[in-house]
Amino acid sequence: MRIAMTSGVDGILVESDESDEMSELIDEAVDRGSPVVTLYGDNTHSARCSFVGVGSYNLGREYGRQVLKLAAAEDTEDPLKVAVLMNAHALNSAQNIVCSGIQDALEQEKLQESEIQMSLIIVDDTNTFSVEESIRDIFMDQTLPDIIICLNELSTTCVYQAVVDYNCVGEIAILGYYDTDTILKAIERNVITATISIDTEQMGAFCVDALQEYYNYGYTSQYFTADVTVIDQSNVEEYLGKQEEAE
């Protein structure tokens, strides 16, 4: 942000959070004449002109629907244990909204009487190593969840690796986030059950649109919401093919 402001750029796209420091930086950039669009993470207390991201509540409902699909396929009367991994240092409310969406979907769209127990597990996201350690602690516990929901790419990759390392493939269903090559191949191997893919090309276009509208009219939409898609065994080959073409 400092480099962008010093350079006097015409606009700034930044992956933000709700920290006071980020609010001050965004406000300073706007005061200097550089409109700011927040991306992925928002800063609602700043003078940013727009936010481009995903609808956290709808994202949560989609995770909830995937849990219900897995519950319907289970042939057991035991409660289904679902763990949602939450970042300890995420300074925004998006995670809480996702969890609300999951809970609402489980309560409103449940078709059978299967009991689903949802718990939140706090992950130390100080760095990659701390995330890995937090997730490995889950697998050291004697009572493992039946389903783990990951709200970011790093958690998804770390849970996938832990499931393999602790020989839990087929015992724990992973609902991930994002569509890296590693995650897609894990779905192909049936280690990760499904992941949520964001239309990043659409997000980029929204960012440009927001800045252009702001320069042309002096204002723009406060929010742009990108499309999300569930990737699972039924369509993973299509996405792997797209990545191979891109390479």
Task: Place the predicted regions along the sequence by residue.
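Hydrophobic alpha-helical
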Residues: M1-D31, I102, S119-K185
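Local beta-strand N-terminus motif with an aromatic residue
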Residues: V9, R48, P79, L144-P145, ...
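Short beta-strand segments enriched in small/hydrophobic residues
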Residues: G11, C49-S50, L80-L91
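Flexible loop/hinge segments that line or gate small-molecule binding clefts
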Residues: M22-N58, T180-E188, I192, L240
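Structural detector of well-ordered beta-strand residues that form the stable sheet scaffold
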Residues: V37, A173-L175, I231
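Hydrophobic alpha-helical segments within soluble ligand-binding/sensing domains
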Residues: V52-L80, I97, F129-E132, D179-I183, ...
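Short, solvent-exposed amphipathic alpha-helices that sit
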Residues: L59-Y63, S93-S114, S130, S134, ...
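Hinge/cleft segment of the Venus flytrap/periplasmic-binding protein
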Residues: L85-M86, D199-E247
